[in-house]
Regions:
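Short acidic (Asp/Glu) and glycine-rich catalytic loops that position anionic groups and cofactors
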Residues: 24-35, 83
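Extended amphipathic alpha-helical segments enriched in small hydrophobics
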Residues: 1-29
């Protein structure tokens, strides 16, 4: 279903961030002062990727929640004359109505509330201007090993072509 696909997308992002974390720890090196410093490449990858992932995560929650994020009854509604109907029609396959509404309320707080909007803005810019962060990463990243791999590949490919033509 589309919900499973969207949740799987969230899982992919989670596992990517966990991989950055693991690499940052496992490839940490001691600096000149004897302090353990996390791997720079993993940190740069995470701090450049997450601000772009967060808006997508928020969007996925909005898509999954759909109209359930808009029509949220209050606690007072559950104590009023509509309570039996709310309990009946708002229950989920695995959740009682109040639990389901609480889950939707949490999703609403994370997506549609003022808090959710501020949080997205915060996540987008916490590490700095995203364009400058990418520019900085480009300028400090050691691209030479990858250029060398491409040169070696092209050299091998050209030698194969030369053998075929001979």
């Amino acid at each position: 279903s589309h919900v499973q696909e969207k949740i799987a997308e969230i899982i992919v992002y989670l596992e990517a961030m966990r991989a950055f974390w693991t690499r940052a720890e496992e490839e940490a090196r001691e600096n000149a002062f004897g302090l353990l410093v996390p791997d720079r490449g993993a940190l740069d990858g995470a701090r450049n990727l997450y601000p772009r992932l967060y808006p997508r995560l928020r969007e996925i929650l909005e898509q999954i929640g759909a109209s359930g994020l808009i029509t949220l009854p209050s606690e007072r509604d559950f104590k009023g004359p509509l309570a039996p109907l709310l309990e009946k029609y708002l229950q989920g396959a695995t959740l009682e109505a109040k639990e389901r509404v609480a889950l939707f309320r949490l999703a609403w707080d994370m997506t549609l509330s003022g808090f959710g909007a501020r949080q997205e803005l915060y996540e987008r810019f916490f590490f700095g201007d995203p364009v400058r962060m990418y520019q900085t990463l480009f300028s400090v990243y050691d691209k030479e090993p990858y250029k060398e791999r491409i040169r070696a590949y092209l050299k091998r490919a050209l030698s194969v072509f030369a053998e075929v033509e001979a």
